[in-house]
């Protein structure tokens, strides 16, 4: 979820205007795919579906040279000089694991709504949940800084099913499959209808409202491309190189006095997930929209990403 100027996007149920435009042929195609995957899972269990996803990912890795090269270039761009110093994992191995991890996550995403709620939640291990709950207890909402690592579409569903009021940011040009699956989720899980989603190119008034109403707002600040000179950024050090990350949403959180945390989602074997919450990036009792505090928080955000990417290079989202 990459965002900087955000707001006034309607909740998912209202956003159904775009989803309603899906053609009947497109819907039929998605129904057939979902039916096949669910039938496979019923016959061979979720473990069987996971093995199918790994085989599918391996095949993609073998034949999709363009995407494989793009992922490897992304890794080189992220690690920079650290590659030459041998401070990062084997790129070839990370690329293969990325293809297999991503395909498995996508397969589960397609049939999540068909699984019993209890079965889903049993597959989630929440690390440092007490940090998030303590931040929410301050009644100022919570801003969770995300990054382009891991499957955020899985994360927001898990958080909603765990009972949290969550909000996020999405691109206006979402794919047809994502919109179709979103419809199915909203039909099955009432919690999904309470998720607030905003577009990434609109005015941020609603973000202030999210914090006032005690929501958990998550956006990613580590955008990989220039989104306009008018957007505020901060320069941070990451693997010995300078990176420019967006700062707008964090500044809004600072102005609202909302605790600022950082989160990651890690996909494990056989469709198990780890939700990881890091310590606050800013002392909640000293929050203020001051340049020094903002810069310190952004550098800590970058340091946490570097630590996470070094440990889970296959979780880079873009490939």
Predicted regions and their residues:
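Non-catalytic C-terminal accessory region of glycerolipid acyltransferases
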Residues: 2-4, 81, 161, 201-319
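Short, flexible loop segments at the rims of nucleotide/cofactor-binding pockets, characterized by
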Residues: 118-124, 193-198, 238-240, 294
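Active-site glycine-rich loop that binds ribose-phosphate moieties when present
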Residues: 127-128, 198-202
């Amino acid at each position: 979820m990459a965002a900087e100027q955000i707001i006034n996007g309607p909740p998912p149920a209202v956003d159904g205007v775009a989803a309603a435009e899906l053609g009947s042929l497109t819907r039929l195609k998605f129904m057939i795919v979902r039916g096949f995957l669910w039938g496979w899972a019923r016959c061979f269990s979720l473990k069987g579906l996971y093995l199918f996803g790994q085989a599918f990912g391996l095949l993609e890795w073998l034949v999709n040279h363009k995407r494989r090269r793009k992922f490897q270039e992304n890794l080189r761009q992220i690690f920079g000089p650290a590659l030459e110093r041998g401070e990062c994992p084997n790129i070839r191995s990370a690329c293969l694991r990325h293809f297999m991890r991503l395909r498995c996550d996508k397969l589960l995403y397609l049939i999540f709504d068909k699984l019993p709620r209890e079965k889903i939640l049993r597959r989630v291990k929440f690390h440092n949940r007490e940090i998030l709950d303590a931040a929410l207890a301050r009644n100022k909402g919570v801003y969770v800084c995300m990054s382009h690592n891991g499957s955020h579409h899985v994360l927001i569903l898990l958080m909603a099913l765990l009972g949290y009021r969550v909000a996020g940011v999405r691109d206006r040009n979402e794919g047809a499959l994502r919109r179709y699956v979103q419809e199915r989720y909203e039909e099955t899980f009432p919690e999904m209808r309470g998720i607030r989603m905003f577009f990434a190119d609109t005015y941020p008034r609603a973000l202030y409202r999210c914090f006032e109403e005690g929501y958990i707002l998550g956006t990613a600040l580590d955008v990989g491309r220039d989104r306009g000179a008018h957007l505020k950024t901060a320069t941070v050090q990451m693997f010995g190189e300078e990176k420019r990350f967006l700062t707008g949403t964090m500044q809004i959180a600072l102005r609202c006095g909302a605790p600022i945390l950082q989160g990651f989602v890690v996909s494990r074997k056989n469709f198990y997930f780890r939700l990881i919450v890091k310590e606050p990036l800013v002392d909640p009792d000293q929050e203020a929209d001051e340049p020094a505090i903002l810069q310190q928080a952004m550098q800590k955000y970058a340091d946490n990403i570097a630590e996470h990417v070094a440990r889970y290079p296959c979780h880079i989202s873009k490939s």
